Structure formats: C-alpha cells, structure tokens
C-alpha cells in the first residue's frame, strides 16, 4: 500500500510542468519566479510577492515589496497584474526617530483610466510639529495624491508611487509647512479595476 502511495505522488509530480512568472510590461516583463502546476488554469488568481530590487536588479530597493496576481498562462509563461506595493516593517522602523512627528494619510483615489487605488503616504518631520502643521501636511498629501491620480493612467501612477516620484512631489510642497526629513508612499493597493468596455451593439440591418 505504501509503495502505491509513493508511486501516485511520483506520477503526480511527473504530470506537472514548470511555469515562469512574468511581471507586467511596464515592470520590464521581469521573470520574478517559477512554479509548478498540473493544470495551468489553477494558477490564475494566485498572488506573488517580489521586491523592486528583484525587478530592477538593484538590491538597495529590496525594502519595497511588490504584489502581483497571475491573470493568464500562455505557453510556459504566467502573466501578471500589479496589485500594489508595501514598504517592509523593518524599513519603516528604521526611519522613525524620537522627538519627531510621523504623519500618515489613507486615501482612495481614482486614476484617469478608472482604477480605484488605496494609497497610504507618510511624512516624517525633522522635529516634532504642532497639530495645526500636522493637519496641514496631511491635507496637502491627500490633495497631491488625488490630483496626480486623476491626471495619470494606472501604469504611470503606480510607477510614480513605487519608484519615489510621487513622494518627491509631496516633499517639495509640504516642506514649506514644516521641515521634513523624509516622505514615503508606504503602501498602495488596487481596490477596483474598470469594467471591461462593452462591445458596440450591432447596427440594425437595412430594410
């Protein structure tokens, strides 16, 4: 009986194939890993975690996690959608200092092409700020993020959020309210994608 169980396991492994997991085109179609499956359709919907460092071959950026979701399998390649990113807890702890203020915001924004994204920007001040300054900086963060999302498509906005251009835009304006030490987009998460466009109704036949 034991031999039969072992043989069934071996047969199961033999029936599976390897699939490369590919990042989206705007993330350079980097291969972020591989997995085995007997039925490739079972891979669809699976979340994959990687880092910006692995996507760009820059190990200094391994403190930024990127979440991808498999959306299709073509041949031996599993393609993915970007679902968001998050800075590691250790990295956030490393930039928190005493006698300073940490200012967090949590905002749902809509991109020009209809994606709903939850964005969590964070500012770190040089010294402790007053409550009125904290409120003003938080409002400015929210306004900058919402405005940029409304102007950009999904791919552009997510690249700016993950690679630091959005946080730099916040820093340039918010530092005039109170001196800032650092600004980060701590997390993004795709909440909803636009519905597929309905196909045009056929024109009525000529009488």
UniProtKB/Swiss-Prot annotation:
InterPro entries: Ribosomal_eS1, Ribosomal_eS1_arc, Ribosomal_eS1_CS
Molecular-function annotations in GO: structural constituent of ribosome
Name by which UniProt lists this protein: Small ribosomal subunit protein eS1
One GO CC term on file: ribosome
Signal peptide span: none
Family: Belongs to the eukaryotic ribosomal protein eS1 family.
Keywords: Ribonucleoprotein, Ribosomal protein
